[in-house]
């Protein structure tokens, strides 16, 4: 019951950090302001002169003892932060810890004000207050938070941590409060003051830990996470390990029961002391804190503001306070600047801006193994990048690529060793004025929080490695070299590295190291990036034996006006001018009033192959399936495998005693190959139950037909069947497309129809539909191989209008195979491209609407590309545009002016060829300007 309450409370605080922080600070300010403006009626030393005996008692405090107490309090606080440092980034945890201490002190002061007590005795009670602060539980809760990989997991893990830690902390707080409260009955005034402040600070600390700290921790981690994809920079490890560690530290049930008994006994003691013996024992009152003798006090006029009076009392400029401040400054500086090397000598190398830091205790040999990768230009434009100073193959969770630099970097190009590594990164954006060598060796600042965590030493023996892997601390305690040894000895399958290491990025890095040693050129993978990618979406879904990811440029064509709605269409391609040409077609069709589309068919297919003893039996089964009642029975079995699968038809064909069945079904917003395969398998089992002689030879008999040129897809359709049409007025054809409707119609007939027929084409009656289909497929995470059938397209053109100057064109695409859920659509970049067109995931208004809309967009974009390319061919601009804008080298010399251009200058005495040359030239790769 308590765990559930703390779970809900932790989830609320961590999911609403701003609200909790603002409410806590507002409550603190309100409590402080209650008595700050009104003031206490009697404040010793400010508006009243205390009795002589009180002053004497105050002045007789042992300064040496208090100085020792303050020193111990500062040292204890430093040790608490050092413990907290072991869980992760010292800056994140330091900020959270400082927030906690500051807020606890501030809130304690507010509580003291709320109870009507003054703060003049808090300066001596401050060390006691600091000694009561225990950051162990804060460290435990922080470990729960740092084991998260996303911000949503941060909220969940903080809530789980609160559910585990909350009951224990509550019990400890109650018992400690009751124990300290015994001191309030000691009749020793100084002890009563200390215990009073201690009780109030415990209550304040408990409130802050339960509310302010979870909210602050959640907010700090959210603000510090600069990686949109991939693991956050503060990611610590597996949640299960943190949970297991906390379970190991769980208090003994016997101790918990003893605490409960102590709590009950202490409550009875206090009840007896305060309630039953009230006549013999004085209650704790204000007189304990400012003055108990009302008759001997003398009222005086304040000589300073109340806040200044409290400040001088809390921190007077005396020698013991100055020594305490110096000690606190030294320890804080040591914690911030030297704690890495002093506390963890195994972290020999730190990542800094252009400097190399080596542990002084390391010998020359170890230091010589540290590589320094150059720095980028120091210009302000490169301030957002940091340089990885050193990388070795001994990193635990952040291993780099085992590829050596090229000879131009003054490093050996010999085969890879375990101590020569170089990170591979894919960086987008300008790199300032640095040289090319420097540009290749820099990465963004948020990508480098990497330090070495192990000594540079030889791998341990194989038996010890197996014990660590199977029984000990697990793969996290192994270096990359040791993991490679286990892979080479077949103890770890290479394809399971991500799962066994429980760190996908490290698994990919280790696999790259293994593969690099097998390549003829060891640094072949240097330019293939792998870091800062969320492989959790890849494993078991999109790719196996991953060694990186392939960045492909993504352009946008649009706005595409389709059925009254505008779309920006993403296209991933390396073919120059493709996006620009498609963009020009979109502009022309938008000016013409847009494109209209119609979905004429929908259904993914799977065509299994079965064999029967004779053709006669095969024919009988074919006729049996044509009976509606029998088809309904198979349909019911088929649809039992998925709530989205809806079987539409079963088409059969015989080849002797072999029977091919083509199951066609709706698959919702998924492309549906896996879905329909499961349904087909169950349908075949049902058919086999009724006809035992059926022998299922293959779930796919190429009668589908998938990823192969086939007339059946062109005729019967597969996936989505879409037709798009538009009418382009004559003035747009002439002004935008630079041609005429009659020329386009004539070219389309002889090129797309006659030419394709002469080539024996099946579904290829178009100019370049596959270009657009493939570019959109790669951008949106579709199966790129399915462009074979999806690119089936017939482009038709006709003249329209009174004078035949308008152009009517249509594109018919009967087999667009795509989906908006599953497969590569789950990858974050591809998902973003789907989101651009508002077709990401399943449609909440109807199953399959998003996939159908995407198919319409594909067909409409194909039509825009067809119109632009055909216009370029008709006008004779194709070769010229590609020679200018689709070459990797510098542009060839610009051609001489055309006859038409010369004619416009006939009235001039001379022709300015240089001006014409400048107007026709363009920078490399800027075909968008001319095509838009």
Swiss-Prot record:
Keywords: Cholesterol biosynthesis, Cholesterol metabolism, Endoplasmic reticulum, Glycoprotein, Lipid biosynthesis, Lipid metabolism, Membrane, NADP, Oxidoreductase, Phosphoprotein, Steroid biosynthesis, Steroid metabolism, Sterol biosynthesis, Sterol metabolism, Transmembrane, Transmembrane helix
Glycan attachment points: 279, 850, 886
One of the protein's GO biological processes: coenzyme A metabolic process
Active site: 575, 707, 783, 882
Main location as per UniProt: endoplasmic reticulum
EC number of this enzyme: 1.1.1.34
Residues making up the signal peptide according to the UniProt record: none
Spans annotated as Disordered: 357-442
Record-level Gene Ontology MF annotations: hydroxymethylglutaryl-CoA reductase (NADPH) activity; NADP binding
Extent of Basic and acidic residues compositional bias: 357-367
Catalysed reactions, as listed in the record: (R)-mevalonate + 2 NADP(+) + CoA = (3S)-3-hydroxy-3-methylglutaryl-CoA + 2 NADPH + 2 H(+)
Pathway membership: Metabolic intermediate biosynthesis; (R)-mevalonate biosynthesis; (R)-mevalonate from acetyl-CoA: step 3/3
Ranges where the record places region Linker: 343-467
InterPro entries (UniProt xref): HMG_CoA_Rdtase, HMG_CoA_Rdtase_cat_sf, HMG_CoA_Rdtase_CS, HMG_CoA_Rdtase_eu_arc, HMG_CoA_Rdtase_metazoan, HMG_CoA_Rdtase_N, HMG_CoA_Rdtase_NAD(P)-bd_sf, HMG_CoA_Rdtase_sub-bd_dom_sf
GO cellular component, one term: endoplasmic reticulum membrane
PANTHER family: 3-HYDROXY-3-METHYLGLUTARYL-COENZYME A REDUCTASE (PTHR10572:SF24)
Homology family: Belongs to the HMG-CoA reductase family.
Protein name: 3-hydroxy-3-methylglutaryl-coenzyme A reductase
Gene name of the encoded protein: HMGCR
């Amino acid at each position: 019951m308590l765990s559930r309450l703390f779970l809900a409370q932790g989830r609320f605080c961590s999911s609403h950090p701003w609200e909790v922080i603002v409410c806590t600070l507002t409550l603190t300010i309100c409590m402080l302001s209650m008595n700050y403006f009104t003031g206490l009626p009697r404040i010793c030393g400010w508006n009243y002169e205390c009795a002589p005996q009180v002053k004497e008692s105050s002045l007789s405090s042992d300064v040496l003892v208090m100085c020792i107490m303050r020193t111990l309090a500062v040292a204890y606080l430093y040790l608490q932060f050092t413990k907290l440092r072991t869980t992760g980034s010292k800056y994140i945890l330091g900020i959270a810890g400082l927030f906690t201490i500051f807020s606890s002190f501030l809130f304690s002061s507010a509580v003291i004000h709320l109870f009507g007590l003054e703060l003049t005795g808090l300066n001596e009670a401050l060390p006691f207050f600091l000694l009561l602060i225990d950051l162990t539980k804060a460290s435990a809760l922080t470990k729960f938070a740092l084991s998260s990989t996303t911000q949503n997991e941060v909220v969940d893990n903080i809530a789980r941590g609160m559910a585990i830690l909350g009951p224990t902390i509550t019990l400890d707080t109650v018992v400690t409060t009751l124990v300290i409260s015994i001191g309030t009955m000691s009749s020793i005034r100084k002890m009563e003051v200390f215990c009073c402040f201690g009780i109030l600070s415990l209550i304040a600390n408990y409130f802050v830990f339960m509310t302010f700290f979870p909210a602050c921790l959640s907010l700090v981690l959210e603000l510090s996470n600069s990686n949109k994809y991939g693991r956050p920079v503060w990611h610590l490890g597996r949640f299960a390990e943190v949970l297991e560690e906390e379970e190991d530290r769980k208090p003994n049930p016997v101790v918990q029961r003893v605490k409960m008994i102590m709590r009950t006994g202490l409550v009875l003691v206090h009840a007896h002391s305060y309630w039953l013996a009230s006549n013999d024992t004085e209650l704790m009152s204000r007189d304990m804190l400012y003055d108990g003798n009302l008759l001997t006090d003398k009222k005086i006029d304040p000589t300073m503001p109340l806040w200044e009076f409290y400040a001088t009392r809390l921190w007077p400029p005396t020698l013991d306070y100055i020594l305490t401040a110096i000690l606190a400054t030294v320890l804080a500086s040591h914690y911030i600047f030297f704690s890495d090397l002093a506390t963890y000598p195994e972290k020999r190398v730190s990542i800094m801006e252009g400097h190399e830091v080596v542990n002084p205790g390391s010998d020359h040999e170890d230091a010589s193994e540290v590589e320094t990768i150059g720095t980028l230009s120091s210009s302000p434009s490169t301030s957002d990048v940091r340089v990885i100073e050193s990388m070795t193959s001994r990193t635990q969770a952040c291993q780099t690529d085992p590829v050596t630099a090229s000879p131009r970097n003054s490093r050996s190009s010999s085969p890879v060793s375990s101590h020569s590594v170089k990170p591979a990164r894919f960086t987008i954006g300008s790199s300032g004025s640095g040289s090319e060598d420097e540009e290749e060796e820099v990465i963004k600042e948020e990508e480098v929080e990497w330090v070495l965590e192990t000594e540079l030493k030889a791998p341990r023996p194989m038996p010890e490695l197996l014990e660590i892997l199977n029984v000990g601390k697990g793969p996290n305690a192994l270096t990359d070299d040791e993991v490679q040894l286990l892979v080479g000895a077949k103890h770890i399958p290479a394809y399971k590295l991500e799962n066994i290491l429980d760190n996908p990025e490290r698994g990919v890095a280790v696999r790259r190291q293994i593969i690099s040693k097998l390549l003829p050129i060891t640094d072949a993978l240097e330019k293939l990036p792998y870091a800062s990618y969320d492989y959790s979406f890849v494993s078991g879904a999109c790719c196996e034996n991953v060694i990186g990811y392939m960045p492909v440029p993504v352009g946008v064509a649009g706005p595409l006006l389709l059925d009254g709605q505008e779309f920006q269409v993403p296209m991933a391609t390396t073919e120059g001018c493709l996006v620009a040409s498609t963009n020009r077609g979109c502009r022309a069709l938008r000016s013409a009033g847009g494109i209209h589309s119609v979905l004429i068919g929908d259904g993914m297919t799977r065509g299994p192959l079965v064999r029967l003893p004779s053709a006669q039996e095969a024919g009988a089964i074919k006729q049996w399936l044509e009976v509606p009642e029998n088809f309904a029975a198979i349909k019911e079995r088929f649809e039992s495998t998925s709530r989205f699968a809806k079987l539409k038809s079963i088409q059969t064909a015989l080849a002797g005693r072999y029977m091919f069945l083509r199951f066609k079904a709706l698959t919702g917003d998924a492309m549906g190959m896996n879905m329909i395969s499961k349904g087909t398998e169950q349908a075949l089992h049902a058919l086999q139950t009724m006809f035992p002689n059926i022998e299922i030879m293959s779930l796919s008999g190429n009668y589908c037909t998938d990823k192969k040129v086939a007339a059946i897809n062109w005729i019967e359709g597969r996936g989505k069947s879409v037709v798009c049409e538009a009418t382009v007025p004559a003035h747009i054809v002439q002004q935008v497309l630079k041609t005429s409707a009659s020329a386009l119609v004539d070219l389309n007939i002889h090129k797309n129809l006659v030419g394709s027929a002469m080539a024996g084409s099946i579904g290829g009656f178009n100019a370049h539909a596959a270009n657009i289909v493939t570019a959109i497929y790669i951008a949106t995470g579709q199966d790129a191989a399915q462009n074979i059938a999806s690119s089936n397209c017939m482009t038709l053109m006709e003249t329209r209008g009174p004078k035949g100057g308008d152009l009517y064109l249509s594109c018919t695409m009967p087999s667009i195979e795509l989906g908006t859920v599953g497969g590569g659509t789950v990858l974050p970049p591809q998902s973003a491209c789907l989101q651009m067109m508002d077709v990401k995931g399943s449609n909440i208004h109807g199953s399959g609407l998003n996939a159908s809309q995407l198919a319409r967009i594909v067909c409409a974009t194909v039509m825009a590309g067809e119109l632009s390319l055909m216009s370029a061919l008709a006008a004779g601009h194709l070769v010229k545009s590609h020679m200018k804008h689709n070459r990797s080298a510098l542009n060839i010399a610009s051609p001489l002016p055309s006859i038409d251009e010369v004619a416009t200058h006939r009235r001039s005495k001379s022709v300015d060829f240089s001006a014409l040359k400048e107007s026709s030239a363009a920078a490399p790769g800027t075909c968008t300007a001319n095509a838009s």
